[in-house]
């Protein structure tokens, strides 16, 4: 019996404010379809699309701008399983396998979460410590791992 999981390819962005590196504030947004769930922008990679192209497309779709510069990317793809209540909605996928990018908003870029298909109803730029306090869901371990990596490399 085969027990291999079916993961959806996905990109995620840790978006730093345009004041980086002078100030390290990270964008986090509150999902409009779940109660008090804050997360980084993320989304699926379309068939034939590169991870970087998906990154820019997803940022435009979710936060209204793709005016960012890539600072770094996490060296591995990270996977997680969907919790029970989400797995039904995301069928046939059991979870996601993600490529994380650290990006900085370009000067003059404007965030607009009132997009064509809004996924968020609020957002903030916060410190790393605040990120860890705000994340209370199944992706927390991955968020901690990725942020710690970028901290160790001296990016944040």
UniProtKB/Swiss-Prot annotation:
CDD domains: NUDIX_Ap4A_hydrolase_plant_like
Nudix hydrolase domain span: 6-148
Signal peptide start-end: none
GO molecular function, one term: bis(5'-adenosyl)-pentaphosphatase activity
Enzyme Commission (EC) number: 3.6.1.-
BP-aspect Gene Ontology terms: nucleoside phosphate metabolic process; ribose phosphate metabolic process
Motif Nudix box mapped to chain: 43-64
Cofactor(s) needed: a divalent metal cation
Gene3D superfamilies listed in its UniProt record: Nucleoside Triphosphate Pyrophosphohydrolase
EC supergroup of this enzyme: hydrolase
UniProt keyword Isomerase present: no
Function: Accelerates the degradation of transcripts by removing pyrophosphate from the 5'-end of triphosphorylated RNA, leading to a more labile monophosphorylated state that can stimulate subsequent ribonuclease cleavage.
Protein name: RNA pyrophosphohydrolase
GN (gene name): rppH
